[in-house]
Amino acid sequence: MANPDFKSPHEIWPQLYQLEKELEFWISSGAFSDRELAARFHERIETIHPFTNGNGRFGRILTGQICKRRRFEMPTWGRALKSEPGKRRQTYIAALTRARRSGDYDALILVLFS
């Protein structure tokens, strides 16, 4: 059974196009801080979920590339919890889910930049 948090296969290309346009707007308008823009982009690309496997890695690469090109602070992906990999993953997934479902990006920003 499909995960209702992720997009259906037929929605992937339109959603990627929409995300590209939103990213352009977020950057040009200064709608969000650098950290929040990175978190919002990361949540959206993970929700679009374009691949069967490897979405997390793909999302981290794209988010990092956007930060690098825009000269934003680079995400550290929860490095503060590196000694506890299980907790690090659980914290990341909980923060991603919270952002996806409630629009509250604070926890995800904390994970991305701690």
Go through the PLM ranges and name each one.
Residues 1-114:
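FIC/Doc superfamily catalytic core
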